[in-house]
Amino acid sequence: MDTVNGKKYLFSKDIDSYFEGVYNGYRFVVRFFKEAFTSPFHFREIINQCFEIGLKSLSLITLTGFIVGVVFTKQSRPSLESFGAVSWLPSLMGIAIMRALGPLVTSLICAGKVGSSISAELGSMKVTEQIDAMEVSAINPFKYLVVTRVMATTISIPILSFYCSFVGLVGSYYNVSNEEATSLQVFCHNAFTNISFLDIFASLTKALVYGFTIGIVSSYKGFFATHGTRGVGKATNQAVILSIFLIFLEEVIIVQIVNWIRYF
């Protein structure tokens, strides 16, 4: 038992605050699933948020995906050359981009760009009492603001992930074609030969989980922002950091599950 400024804590202020945050986050997720499957369904707002997320991220994902494809191909070539296996380069890139790089790069970009935007927007509405005004007006702010944005990130990020994988393979082909005479048909055949249905399914699962994580974490931090503009900035920063941490944690867990299925 610890006491700070006359207030008693079970362990300490920081530890109690951590467990309280975990519990509140759990309640927030449970409330999301309850609200998501009850009417009204704001389909128009979900579509608007999907377009906004896509337009905000498309140019950056295009540039980053292309660069990742080029750089990863350049870095992989010397290692394969030492084993006389340069012909396996397209296959390596296809597997690496589809299994890991596409979903991971997309989610990290969206965590910084989309997640911060959602958290800042909801946080600003919270501290300026716009959310309270919606409740007074008999509008469910959780359903209209949170559910729509989480659904939008869950839908949009898988689409952006496959687009990023495509652009990454374009970047890889650009590098391969500059180094050796390889036709597009041969590159595509080699790149997709070793990609299984499990790889595509795992990539889709990762993107869905990452999209949901970014949406729910950013909405949670913004929805409960306090202490004015300073609190909004703090909530935005926490949303990005926590989203990225959870994405890497989920990456490890999903990879372990997929590998268990692959070799079962």
Describe the residue ranges of each PLM region.
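Short, membrane-interfacial amphipathic segments enriched in basic
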Residues: 2-44, 221-226
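Active-site cofactor/substrate anionic-group-binding motifs, chiefly glycine-
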Residues: 53-105, 109
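Selective transmembrane-helix segments that form parts of the transport pathway or gating/packing helices
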Residues: 54, 58, 62, 101, ...
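Hydrophobic alpha-helical transmembrane segments that constitute the membrane-spanning cores
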Residues: 64-67, 147-176, 217, 250, ...
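Membrane-interfacial helix-loop-helix connectors in multipass membrane proteins
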Residues: 75-98, 165-208, 216-236, 257-264
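Hydrophobic alpha-helical transmembrane segments of multi-pass membrane transport proteins
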Residues: 89-132, 217
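Short hydrophobic alpha-helical segments within the ABC transporter permease transmembrane module
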Residues: 93, 97, 137, 141-155, ...
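Short cytoplasmic-facing helical segments at TM-TM junctions of multi-pass membrane proteins
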Residues: 122-147, 229-232
